Amino acid sequence: MTVTDPIADMLVRIKNANMRRHPTVDVPYSKMKEKIIEILLREGYIAKYEVIGEIPQKYIRVYLKYKGKTPVIQDVKRVSKPGRRYYVNKEEIPRVLGGLGIAILSTSKGIMTDKEARLLGIGGELICMVW
């Protein structure tokens, strides 16, 4: 079955696994998904991840992070979608929950957080927000 929006599919898999308190979740591999997961790891939203398998069955195993029984990722929101792309310039980059969450952008310098994009003074496509 073909997925129309693979990034949204990955985010929903992570969100659903978090809600059910699963220790891991597997998502089909792509370079963009791996970059987004690297950001989640760097920002402390997941414990670790590993790429498993060979193409065409390659996937990413994400190890979820919890504080006691509470998931670290409270919610995720997909902003830019295949049918409606959402671009922001450097002045329009949103602050997620007053700086408690992160926004992930795809810029000309690669995929990065809202803080990194503000420091570089560049905008881009607003992929998602995590808090």
Curated annotation (Swiss-Prot):
SUPFAM superfamilies: Ribosomal protein S8 (SSF56047). The keyword Ribonucleoprotein applies. InterPro entries: Ribosomal_uS8, Ribosomal_uS8_CS, Ribosomal_uS8_sf. One of its GO terms (biological process) is translation. Keywords: Ribonucleoprotein, Ribosomal protein, RNA-binding, rRNA-binding. Pfam families: Ribosomal_S8 (PF00410). It comes from the Bacteria. GO terms for molecular function: rRNA binding; structural constituent of ribosome. One of its GO terms (cellular component) is cytosolic small ribosomal subunit. NCBIfam families: PRK00136.1 (NF001109). HAMAP family: Ribosomal_uS8_B. One of the primary rRNA binding proteins, it binds directly to 16S rRNA central domain where it helps coordinate assembly of the platform of the 30S subunit. Part of the 30S ribosomal subunit. Contacts proteins S5 and S12. Belongs to the universal ribosomal protein uS8 family. This is Small ribosomal subunit protein uS8. The lineage of its organism: Bacteria, Pseudomonadati, Dictyoglomota, Dictyoglomia, Dictyoglomales. The gene is rpsH.
